[in-house]
């Protein structure tokens, strides 16, 4: 599971890195056009070599704008929706308002951008637009009055039509837009902007400078996210290896501690085999005050948790539990004798 999560993070980091590079290439490929009057000459020079991706700003205009049915707003894209609102009686015999969305209708006309110095046609369908349309009109049309018999039948059925709400959303004439796309010539020789087969394409209300800055910030965020995911993936993948190395180091240290303790016991046994001359004895004078581990040095430490005093300082540092009661050792106190 750790390996799978690690590989997933690494793949996510690689994907974000590729997205970062793609966004960076998109930013570098965009040619900013500050005045539309210069676009004709720019297309003449550069579009012959590679597809020319430009970024332009201007106000929306059209020779044949669409007029909203319920208002005087003119636009180039129109989306009209109708919502029938009714009252229904539920099982508690209370009336609840419900609505049913009818089939929406869309319209669009040829449009262009105009910045005061020139204009350029934009060949973008409403499906490719990706803009939040402005509400041109929002009208509620009440249902026609019904006869007394029809009203009584509707009451008995638990159904009453309130009316229809008509909402029209448009891209109004004069709306400032920023368009990033490919500049080409149409069959009439006029310059138009269209969606490129490969490359960036944006239609937004954001000004040109803010759009470029936003794309740069987005690229940097993707870069940092890719680095973070990659590092996390490497850590998750290498975690079993790190745990294995630490376990081997711990086993090696434990084995050396045991060998050291065994060597001390063997050395102590060899010394005890020699004649014992006077030396340290217990308080009763019967048994030497020797460490119970090495049986060589006198015990001079006490374990705070259990209170036993039975080991010398070197042996107490090698132990994890008390050799008498097997309680875990947390703190060792050294005892000084007079």
From Swiss-Prot:
Any single GO CC term annotated in Swiss-Prot or TrEMBL for this entry: chloroplast envelope
Stored Gene3D superfamilies: Zinc/RING finger domain, C3HC4 (zinc finger)
Residue intervals annotated with topology Cytoplasmic: 247-338
PROSITE patterns, per the entry: ZF_RING_2 (PS50089)
Enzyme Commission number(s): 2.3.2.27
Transmembrane domains' residue ranges: 1-21, 224-246
Keywords noted in UniProt: Chloroplast, Membrane, Metal-binding, Plastid, Plastid outer membrane, Transferase, Transmembrane, Transmembrane helix, Ubl conjugation pathway, Zinc, Zinc-finger
Keyword Zinc included in the entry's annotation: yes
Descriptive protein name: E3 ubiquitin-protein ligase SPL1
Organism: Arabidopsis thaliana (Mouse-ear cress)
Lineage per the UniProt record: Eukaryota, Viridiplantae, Streptophyta, Embryophyta, Tracheophyta
Gene: SPL1
């Amino acid at each position: 599971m750790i390996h799978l999560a690690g590989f997933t993070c690494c793949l996510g980091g690689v994907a974000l890195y590729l997205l970062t590079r793609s966004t960076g290439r998109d930013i570098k490929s965009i040619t900013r056009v500050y005045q539309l009057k210069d676009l004709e000459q720019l297309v003449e020079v550069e579009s012959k070599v590679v597809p020319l991706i430009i970024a332009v700003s201007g106000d929306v205009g059209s020779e044949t704008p669409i007029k909203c049915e319920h208002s005087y707003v003119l636009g180039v894209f129109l989306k009209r929706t109708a919502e029938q609102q009714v009252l229904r009686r539920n099982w508690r015999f209370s009336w609840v308002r419900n609505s049913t969305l009818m089939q929406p209708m869309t319209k669009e006309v040829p449009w262009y951008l105009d910045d005061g110095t020139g204009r350029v046609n934009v060949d973008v369908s409403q499906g490719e637009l990706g803009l939040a349309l402005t509400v041109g009109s929002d009208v509620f049309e009440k249902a026609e009055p019904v006869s007394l018999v029809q009203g009584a039948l509707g009451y008995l059925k638990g159904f009453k039509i309130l009316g229809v709400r008509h909402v029209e959303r448009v891209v109004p004439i004069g709306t400032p837009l920023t368009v990033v796309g490919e500049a080409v010539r149409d069959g009439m020789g006029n310059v138009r902007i269209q969606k490129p087969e490969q490359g960036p394409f944006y239609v937004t209300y954001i000004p040109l400078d803010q759009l470029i800055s936003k794309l740069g910030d987005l690229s940097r965020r993707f870069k940092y996210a890719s680095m973070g995911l990659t590092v996390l993936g490497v850590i998750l993948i290498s975690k079993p290896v790190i745990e294995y190395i630490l376990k081997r180091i711990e086993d090696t240290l434990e084995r050396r501690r045991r060998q050291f303790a065994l060597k001390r016991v063997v050395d102590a046994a060899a010394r005890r085999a020699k004649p014992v001359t006077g030396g340290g004895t217990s308080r009763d004078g019967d048994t030497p005050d020797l460490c119970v581990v090495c049986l060589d040095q006198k015990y001079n430490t006490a374990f705070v948790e259990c209170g036993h005093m039975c080991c010398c300082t070197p042996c107490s540092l090698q132990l994890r539990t008390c050799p008498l009661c097997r309680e875990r050792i947390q703190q060792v106190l050294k005892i000084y004798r007079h």
